[in-house]
Amino acid sequence: MTDRIVPATLVFREDGTVVSPLYGDIYHSAAGALAQADHVFIRGNGLPERWRHERAFTIIETGFGTGCNFLATWAAWRADPSHCERLHFVSVEKHPFAREDLRRAAAHIVAYTTITPIAPLVDELANAWPALTPGVHRLEFDDGRVTLTLVFGDALDVLPNLALRAHAFYLDGFAPSKNADLWSPAIFKSLAKLADERATFATYTSSGAVKRALDEAGFAYRKVDGFAGKRAMLVGEFAPRWRVRRHEPPRAFSTDRRDAIVIGAGLAGCAVVERLAARGWHVTLIERRERIASEASGNPAGVFHPMIARDDNLAARLSRAGFLHALHRWRALERAGHAFSRSTHGLVQLATSDDEFERMRESIDALGVPAELASALSRDDARALLRTDVAHGGWLFAQGGSISPATLAAAQCAAAGDRLSRIVGVEIARLERGGDGRWRALDASGATIAQASVVVVANAADAARIAGLRHAPTQRVRGQLTLLPPGSAPAVPLPVIGDGYVVPLANGVTLTGATYEPDDTDATPREAGHRENLERLERLLPAFSANALDAGALAGRVGFRCVASDRLPLVGELGDEAAAAREAAALTGARLRDVPRATGLYGAFGYGSRGLVWAALGAELIAAQIDGEPWPLERELAEAIDPARFLVRALRHGRVA
């Protein structure tokens, strides 16, 4: 189980310095946090000069603390007219402050600075501050040109689980005598595996133990004058005298032309379109229907919420990461003027028994889930909130709700602007990579419909076929939903899920569903499916009577989920199955990083019933992989959804030839 996050306690000394009672140390010099950040970390890493030569520049910090190093770096980037196009700041923090404590600490610090543009940044940071849950949280500022990737957890655990290429390291944190773990050889070995060949570092300490650990990990150091009269600090660069890593950190996809094809204009594909366009890629979106979001993404509404499990398993961690990232992206779309239809009053998940309710309540307590993410709801509280009878209590997801998927897809395409070209009513039969390294999307006659440096297959169950994948087991699962006329169902004020779901729509109509029918290809709504949905609704909300309606007279819709055999999505660069077959004997013990890849070919499919939760995170992961940026989730989670995981399993069992 993932360790719960214990927030930092905000304490000020008499001189105004922020201090940690847990570690008995100060967060910054009494001579000024921002001046210290500039002298030690910004100037110590040769900034801003060094980032002027990069399209994107990545910094890793080993302790976020009050956020002053990030704020100072962000302000320096803003003030530099020759700054890099995109700045990535990745920071690890075991004990993050709660939102308002962070705001107070940072505001107190910047109140005494002469860096005038920095004060407004404090509120931007605090307003975007995430829920204090373990894992990776990606925040964007300045229209996405500045990205803060926060990693909440113990650095010893989380640093080996990151996927990125760092240009600079801010080695910060409490003094080695106060928090020895953060300065241990294991930390520096993890950083060495993430370092660019030209990476630099800076730190305020010059302790002998730190120097030895740096040297052992392949970092060359030298002493320079410290801050505010401190005799010495250390700066240096990654300069290994021997091989210190088996695998190189991620690099950007190499191409002279930043153009891409996305096949499939549902939730998965449109999310990818928006993320690539935001990075300057020109995207051709190909959809076999005449309009976008016509298939499963054309449902009147879909629900979104995280999954909570007592053991905080992979699926739960992925759904939490996807849920929180989706909320961040959707708010950014709305701030940019790209509105879509979604509810904002929360979602209730009801237990199916008293025992299940107790397990749900205990899970929240054991995991330390913040109330802003989920809270237990007694039966009486659920009745009062929903204004109808319920059989059991459950969870309230205060930020959950429902969305019209088609309006979200339209908003994402609108955000892409003139970087998006659409081709609709055309079905792609196969993909082909030419001798020039560019991919061509061909129709059944062999005609080239579009060509580009990169292709993302995001067309659900057809993705594996188009990409020529034999080792990507997915299944089409029929789902029928039912529309209930006004006044025929309890008028709940927000979506309710449990054994099925119920969503209030406009004009008093209620949506309920959905059936789960593997390998059933009938696209026509059936009376039996409506009856099943009505019976499920009766169990969910006892005030409803399934027999009160004529199932044969109801309207509805059928969509098809694409579900992988392990129930997790397939997101990321695809494996090159032909190359793997040629090298099968050497790859029987391969790991995912050893598998040959289909250069420039990516997948975003197999989202099942969780497209709203996973699509935004999947799109961000693909865009980050393509552009060589820090990944928006831990490597362990990225590998759990790597499309090549099934190829690796087949190689291990000798099924690839």
Curated annotation (Swiss-Prot):
Residues 263-657 are annotated as: FAD-dependent cmnm(5)s(2)U34 oxidoreductase. It catalyses: 5-aminomethyl-2-thiouridine(34) in tRNA + S-adenosyl-L-methionine = 5-methylaminomethyl-2-thiouridine(34) in tRNA + S-adenosyl-L-homocysteine + H(+). GO terms for biological process: methylation; tRNA wobble base modification. The keyword Methyltransferase applies. Keywords: Cytoplasm, FAD, Flavoprotein, Methyltransferase, Multifunctional enzyme, Oxidoreductase, S-adenosyl-L-methionine, Transferase, tRNA processing. GO terms for cellular component: cytoplasm. Coiled coil: none annotated. It is found in: Cytoplasm. Its EC number is 2.1.1.61, 1.5.-.-. SUPFAM superfamilies: FAD-linked reductases, C-terminal domain, FAD/NAD(P)-binding domain. GO terms for molecular function: flavin adenine dinucleotide binding; oxidoreductase activity, acting on the CH-NH group of donors; tRNA (5-methylaminomethyl-2-thiouridylate)(34)-methyltransferase activity. Residues 1-239 are annotated as: tRNA (mnm(5)s(2)U34)-methyltransferase. Its main location: cytoplasm. Its cofactor is FAD. Gene3D superfamilies: D-Amino Acid Oxidase, subunit A, domain 2 (3.30.9.10), FAD/NAD(P)-binding domain (3.50.50.60), Vaccinia Virus protein VP39 (3.40.50.150). Transmembrane segments: none annotated. PANTHER family: SARCOSINE DEHYDROGENASE-RELATED, TRNA 5-METHYLAMINOMETHYL-2-THIOURIDINE BIOSYNTHESIS BIFUNCTIONAL PROTEIN MNMC. In the N-terminal section; belongs to the methyltransferase superfamily. tRNA (mnm(5)s(2)U34)-methyltransferase family. Catalyzes the last two steps in the biosynthesis of 5-methylaminomethyl-2-thiouridine (mnm(5)s(2)U) at the wobble position (U34) in tRNA. Catalyzes the FAD-dependent demodification of cmnm(5)s(2)U34 to nm(5)s(2)U34, followed by the transfer of a methyl group from S-adenosyl-L-methionine to nm(5)s(2)U34, to form mnm(5)s(2)U34. This is tRNA 5-methylaminomethyl-2-thiouridine biosynthesis bifunctional protein MnmC. It comes from Burkholderia mallei (strain SAVP1). The lineage of its organism: Bacteria, Pseudomonadati, Pseudomonadota, Betaproteobacteria, Burkholderiales.
